[in-house]
């Protein structure tokens, strides 16, 4: 980014001042939540805020809502993003198209475009709507030009199995940013950005392990941080790693183990004289929130109706059909998410889903939930331990462990880090906005 070459005269002292550092932008486009921040020299990064009814929030839900097409009107219904998308969707009694976790598609070649209200949207088009809303807000609130941005990216994109997939994901994200009005884009790893923000809290130099737990991925960075690093401006990164396991994964475990059996998973139906299990893939789609709209495909609905007619427990399959046909997937998602959040503070939580004629209630104990995510935690642990061993770091040399992101609150996650590094080393704060602030601070070093 070019600095402002203008030199102004200080009105008080009458002396020439240094060229003014322009405000720079950091944008964290997340699977579940996004945020955007600005920073200038000598100041902390400042977050943009968004209206949410009578409240404001610095965390912008990465959600799109397309209202149903009104054939009697020539006026195109406005596409909603963030908090407005959720509120509009609920006000419309769940009619229309709600799109969640769209970041999860970046590394997948299976998604190229989708048709909504008679128009085809590419993945880049959809992501650009969210990024454009974030950009517009920061322009309105801070008066910046907002053509240059440091944009966060995970260490490993969800669904990206090869280097070619990673390249595809980055190219798509860059194209979406360009469509949103960002003509100059620099990428930074999200856990590295979190390190820049955590560094503002340090009054000494130390080796830090950063854990960024998003909706789609969990990413880790080893970094040398502190005042000494800031003075020299040297690259703080020792090493990075990541795994495609995070908040959405934990949600899916609740869906598959608690909810899906009440919608027919594990039951049977008769086809051509043979007793067969109800297809598991139906529930796998339902547990991946960003794929639920695929279940409304006419062929899938025909399969469901056939299964229901020959099912051993037709009432359960009927409930699944209602959830799909009445667009109740988001309400089900919120019920699952609410249960997971409640388990961060309590030993058990009541799962309640009561919409239309579908009524599901159960109590979930924390120990059961932890048994479902045990393998996920082990994979996260392996990722962290491999990162440390690859760089020949002694565990005792790590001064602190900074955990950010919504899933950093999950007790099982915290117990692993406390047991491995010591509870006194665990740090946190601003779990949903740390990365955006860090990206803005990183942008200062580019300015």
Task: Label every model-predicted segment.
Residues 7-56, 86-210, 224-244, 360-391, ...:
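N-terminal phosphate-binding loop and flanking beta/alpha elements of the actin-like ATPase fold
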Residues 34-38, 62-65, 219-222:
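Short beta-strand scaffold segments in enzyme catalytic cores
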Residues 63-77, 249, 253, 257-262:
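P-loop NTPase motor core
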Residues 216-221, 436:
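Short glycine/serine/threonine-rich phosphate/pyrophosphate-binding segments
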Residues 217-218, 296-306, 404-409:
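Core structural elements
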Residues 225-355:
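Phosphate-binding glycine-rich/basic clefts of nucleotide- and phosphate-handling proteins
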Residues 255-260, 264-265, 419, 423, ...:
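Short, well-ordered loop/turn and helix-capping segments at boundaries between secondary-structure elements
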């Amino acid at each position: 980014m070019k600095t402002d070459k203008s030199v102004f005269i200080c009105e008080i002292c009458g002396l020439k001042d240094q060229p003014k550092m322009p405000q720079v932008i950091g944008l964290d486009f997340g699977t579940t939540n996004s945020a955007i921040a600005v920073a200038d020299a000598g100041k902390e990064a400042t977050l943009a805020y968004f209206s949410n009814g009578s409240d404001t929030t610095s965390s912008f839900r990465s959600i799109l809502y397309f209202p149903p097409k009104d054939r009697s009107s020539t006026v195109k219904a406005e596409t909603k993003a963030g908090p407005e998308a959720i509120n509009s969707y609920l006000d419309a009694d769940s009619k229309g198209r709600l799109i969640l976790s769209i970041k999860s598609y970046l590394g997948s070649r299976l998604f190229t475009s989708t048709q909504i209200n008679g128009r085809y949207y590419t993945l880049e088009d959809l992501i650009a709507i969210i990024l454009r809303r974030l950009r517009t807000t920061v322009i309105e609130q801070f008066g910046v030009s907002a053509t240059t941005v440091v944009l966060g990216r995970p260490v490993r994109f969800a669904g990206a199995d090869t280097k070619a997939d990673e390249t595809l994901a980055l190219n798509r994200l860059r194209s979406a940013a360009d469509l949103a009005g960002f003509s100059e884009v620099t990428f930074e790893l999200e856990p590295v950005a979190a390190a820049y923000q955590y560094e503002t809290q340090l009054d000494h130099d130390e080796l830090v392990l950063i854990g960024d737990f998003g909706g789609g991925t969990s990413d880790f960075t080893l970094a040398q941080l502190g005042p000494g690093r800031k003075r020299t401006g040297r690259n703080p990164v020792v090493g990075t790693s990541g795994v495609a396991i995070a908040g959405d994964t934990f949600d899916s475990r609740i869906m598959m183990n608690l909810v899906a059996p009440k919608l027919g998973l594990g039951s049977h139906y008769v086809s051509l004289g043979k007793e067969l299990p109800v297809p598991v893939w139906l529930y796998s789609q339902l547990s991946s929130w960003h794929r639920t709209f695929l279940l409304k495909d006419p062929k899938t609905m025909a399969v469901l109706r056939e299964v229901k007619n020959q099912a051993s427990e037709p009432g359960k399959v009927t409930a699944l059909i209602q959830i799909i046909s009445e667009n109740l997937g988001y309400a089900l998602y919120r019920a699952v998410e609410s249960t997971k959040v409640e388990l961060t503070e309590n030993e058990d939580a009541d799962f309640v889903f009561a919409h239309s004629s579908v009524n599901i209630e159960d109590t979930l104990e924390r120990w059961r939930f932890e048994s479902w995510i045990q393998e996920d935690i082990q994979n996260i642990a392996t990722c962290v331990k491999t990162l440390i061993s690859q760089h020949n770091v002694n565990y005792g040399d790590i001064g602190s462990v900074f955990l950010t992101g919504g899933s950093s609150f999950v007790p099982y996650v915290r117990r692993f880090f406390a047991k491995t590094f010591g509870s006194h080393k665990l740090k946190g704060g601003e779990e949903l906005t740390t990365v955006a602030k860090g990206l803005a601070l990183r942008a200062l070093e580019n300015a």
